[in-house]
Amino acid sequence: MCKGLAALPHSCLERAKEIKIKLGILLQKPDSVGDLVIPYNEKPEKPAKTQKTSLDEALQWRDSLDKLLQNNYGLASFKSFLKSEFSEENLEFWIACEDYKKIKSPAKMAEKAKQIYEEFIQTEAPKEVNIDHFTKDITMKNLVEPSLSSFDMAQKRIHALMEKDSLPRFVRSEFYQELIK
């Protein structure tokens, strides 16, 4: 073992072991040719049961993530695209925050806040979003007494990340290019 690994926290080493095991499983030779087939769609699924949007609206999405998110077809299209890239956690977090803001009951708000935290914010959460430690700490402090604004800072950071990274990839994708034809 190299000297650098000893300095890593135990949780990092455990995570590295888990990844090594998963990679080992993926690298095993298949027993049959049928095992080689991985059920993966190269193109994202088109959104179902959502009224198609106009060309003008779709063209506006290039410049405005907010316009995309406010349009049901745009949101469904964006979500399908992100799913095809296995990177939908940021959008799912943003949607969960929007749903959270609609809650009126303090008890339900506390329950939903805990659920969002466990699913997206806490370290090694199933759909952990990429936010800095400062934002994570502020969010955790806000959850001591949940309010409608508890996730605002984290949601703004994720919105900025989607605007800077996910939206440009979506706009360059074949899927979006077909939408605007």
Swiss-Prot record:
Keywords: Cytoplasm, Membrane, Signal transduction inhibitor. SMART domains: RGS. GO terms for molecular function: GTPase activator activity; GTPase activity. Pfam families: RGS. GO terms for cellular component: cytosol; intracellular membrane-bounded organelle; plasma membrane. It comes from the Eukaryota. Transmembrane segments: none annotated. GO terms for biological process: G protein-coupled receptor signaling pathway; negative regulation of signal transduction; negative regulation of vascular associated smooth muscle cell proliferation; regulation of G protein-coupled receptor signaling pathway. Residues 64-180 form the RGS domain. Inhibits signal transduction by increasing the GTPase activity of G protein alpha subunits thereby driving them into their inactive GDP-bound form. Binds to G(i)-alpha and G(o)-alpha, but not to G(s)-alpha. PANTHER family: REGULATOR OF G PROTEIN SIGNALING (PTHR10845), REGULATOR OF G-PROTEIN SIGNALING 5 (PTHR10845:SF42). This is Regulator of G-protein signaling 5. It comes from Homo sapiens. The gene is RGS5.
